[in-house]
A protein has these predicted regions:
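Membrane-interface loops
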Residues: 105, 142, 154-222
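Alpha-helical transmembrane segments of integral membrane proteins
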Residues: 78-85, 156-164, 225-232
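Aromatic-anchored segments of alpha-helical transmembrane domains
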Residues: 91-93, 168-172, 235-244
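Membrane-embedded catalytic cores of phosphoryl/pyrophosphoryl-handling enzymes
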Residues: 64, 72-76, 188-289
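N-terminal transmembrane-helix/juxtamembrane module of multi-pass inner/ER membrane proteins
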Residues: 57-137, 177-179, 183-189
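Hydrophobic alpha-helical transmembrane segments
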Residues: 133-150, 216
Length: 289
C-alpha cells in the first residue's frame, strides 16, 4: 500500500490529505477525543485499502456517472428475512421494556452489577469513548462517509448510508417518545437528557458501523484487512453501549434495544440495496463477460 506522503509529514501538518483532486480531507485536531481520531484513521485506512485495489483516481477519470465498485464474487445475499426477524425481536423487546417486565428489571440489575465500577481509568475511558456515539459526532461521521462515497462516485452506497442513518435515528426519536422511559436515577457521570429507551448512542453506532461492515465486505479485497476491519467496526458499538451503561445514563435494556434497532435498519437497508442495485449490476457484469 503506497501513501502519497509520509505519516511523519502528515502528522506534522495536523491533518491527513490524500490525493487532493479526488479525496476528502480528514482533519485530526488535538482537541478531538481519542475515539474520534481512531475512527477517522480507520476510515482513512479503508480508503487506502480500496484505492490500492482499484487505483481510484485513474478509474474515476475513465468513468461517467456512477462507478460500480465491488470486490467480492459473492456479496452478502438478501437480508430481508433476517431484517424481519430483527423487527419481531425488537417489537417484543420494546413491549417488555414499556410494560415494566420483571424480566427486564432482573436483566438490567444483573448486567449493571457486572459492568459498573468506579475504577478511575475506566471512568476516564468511558467518558472519552462515549462521545463517539453523540448525535453530533455520529452525524459528522456519517457526513464524512457520505462525502467519501460521493467522491468515489458510489452514489448507491452513499444513499444507502444516508437512508439507513436517517430512518434509524428518526425511528429512534419516535420510539423514545412512545415508550417515555426515564433514565436511571443514579448520578450520571456525563450529561444526558431526553428519554432512556432506546439508547440513541447504541442505535446510531450500530447503524453506522453496521454500514461500514457492509461496505468493508463489498469493497475490501484483502481477507486479512477485511476481517480485521469488520472486527474493529463491530467493537465500536459494543464499547459505546458499554460506556452508556457505565456512565449511568442508560439501562442495559436500552443499549440492547438500540443495538437491535440499528442492526434492523442496516439489514433492511442492505436488502433494498441488494435487490435494486447490487444484484442487477452483478447480472449486467456477467452478461458482458
Amino acid at each position: 500500500m503506497t501513501l502519497n506522503c509520509s505519516l511523519t509529514r502528515m502528522a506534522t501538518l495536523g491533518f491527513f490529505n490524500t490525493r487532493r483532486v479526488h479525496n476528502p480531507i480528514l482533519r485530526l485536531h488535538s482537541s478531538q477525543p481519542l475515539s474520534e481520531k481512531i475512527f477517522l484513521l480507520l476510515l482513512l485506512d479503508l480508503y487506502f485499502l480500496i484505492d490500492n485495489d482499484y487505483n481510484l483516481p485513474q478509474m474515476l477519470k475513465n468513468t461517467r456517472g456512477s462507478a460500480f465498485l465491488i470486490n467480492t464474487k459473492r456479496p452478502p445475499k438478501d437480508t430481508l428475512i433476517p431484517g424481519i426477524i430483527f423487527v419481531v425481536i425488537y417489537a417484543v423487546w420494546a413491549a417488555l421494556v414499556s410494560s415494566g417486565s420483571q424480566f427486564i428489571h432482573n436483566f438490567d440489575n444483573t448486567v449493571i452489577k457486572i459492568v459498573c465500577n468506579t475504577n478511575p481509568a475506566n471512568v476516564a475511558f468511558a467518558k472519552d469513548f462515549t462521545n463517539l456515539g453523540n448525535t453530533s459526532t455520529i452525524t459528522i461521521e456519517t457526513i464524512i462517509l457520505f462525502i467519501i462515497l460521493l467522491v468515489f462516485k458510489q452514489y448507491a452506497y452513499a444513499w444507502f448510508t444516508a437512508g439507513v442513518m436517517i430512518c434509524a435515528n428518526g425511528y429512534n426519536w419516535i420510539i423514545k417518545h412512545a415508550v417515555m422511559r426515564h433514565r436511571p436515577t443514579i448520578k450520571h457521570l456525563v450529561y444526558a437528557d431526553g428519554y432512556s429507551f432506546p439508547s440513541g448512542h447504541s442505535v446510531g453506532s450500530a447503524a453506522l458501523f453496521g454500514i461500514l461492515i457492509i461496505l468493508t465486505i463489498l469493497l475490501v479485497k484483502s481477507k486479512f484487512w477485511k476481517t480485521l476491519l469488520i472486527i474493529i467496526w463491530a467493537l465500536f458499538p459494543i464499547l459505546i453501549g458499554y460506556t452508556r451503561i457505565f456512565v449511568h445514563v442508560h439501562y442495559p435494556s436500552d443499549v440492547l434495544g438500540g443495538w437491535i434497532e440499528g442492526i434492523t435498519f442496516v439489514l433492511l437497508g442492505y436488502s433494498f440495496l441488494y435487490h435494486f442495485y447490487i444484484e442487477p449490476k452483478m447480472l449486467e457484469m456477467k452478461r458482458k463477460q
